Amino acid sequence: MNNAGHGPTRRLRGLGVLAGVALLAALWLLWLLGSAPRGTPAPQPTITILVWHWPFTDQPPELPSDTCTRYGIARCHLSANRSLLASADAVVFHHRELQTRRSHLPLAQRPRGQPWVWASMESPSHTHGLSHLRGIFNWVLSYRRDSDIFVPYGRLEPHWGPSPPLPAKSRVAAWVVSNFQERQLRARLYRQLAPHLRVDVFGRANGRPLCASCLVPTVAQYRFYLSFENSQHRDYITEKFWRNALVAGTVPVVLGPPRATYEAFVPADAFVHVDDFGSARELAAFLTGMNESRYQRFFAWRDRLRVRLFTDWRERFCAICDRYPHLPRSQVYEDLEGWFQA
């Protein structure tokens, strides 16, 4: 028998076996490397947020190193020390202090590529001077849901355990107002309601101011609270709704953005919207004619949810760190006024 052709075949088979063994060895080595204990991941750098003007005051609060940790945000350094301008990861400017003078901005000293944040919790009706701020800011912090850093005045969070008992209600409706102007829609609606509904009015506008600690317990005595915003704008739902009504344990009667906006934040049966009625007389009749069973349905949400307020500017500014890794560095608001007025 002639075996001349078997030599090359055997050599090829041998090479194939060797290649297979080498492949298995490589796979085994990769598996070992993948399953080996990994080293400690590199710590994430701390983000420094410089607040150029502290809102409504020349004296910023104390800002210890753990300020943002208190709000559940780690590796975030909040400072009002302007000497950090060159090294800060972002600088935030509150609009009220910029409202009349663009010169308050350190434009000449701005490091290249440093994100600047425009911050305001006021409505467009009370925000002026935006036309002077074109092409300056990269991000926006506001109550608008489409803001880069969205900070509402409040929200509902899951809650387990018994809800606090509702205060006893001995009166019908209350309203706390400091700046009463007849041209405002809320003033006109109040004038239309007054002949049909007993509304007790508190605040500087009526010569009956309430101290900060007095407001909630005072309103808690009423079945309804007029949560009338001073102007009606997209997503503009303030403490008049969250604190003055929901925290106080009363039913808010709301004048503000459309019902659908409120329903994005709270259950549909947690409030009364003025748009649901054809006239102030109809609204008053609904409120005064409501039986106790129907009234209690407005508080069904309290069995599973609780109100969380966002009133501290420190917490609001710390939220920048939470969003920082996800925000576009190259974005610029060329027409901040057009965006905010939309």
From Swiss-Prot:
Its EC number is 2.4.1.-. The keyword Repressor does not apply. Leukocytic/myeloid lineage cells. Induction: By T-cell activation. Up-regulated by LIF. Induced by IL1B. Induced at higher levels by interleukin 12 in activated T cells. Down-regulated by IL4. Glycans are attached at N81, N291. It comes from the Eukaryota. It is found in: Golgi apparatus, Golgi stack membrane. Changing R110Q: Found in patients with ulcerative colitis; loss of alpha-(1,3)-fucosyltransferase activity. This is Alpha-(1,3)-fucosyltransferase 7. The gene is FUT7.
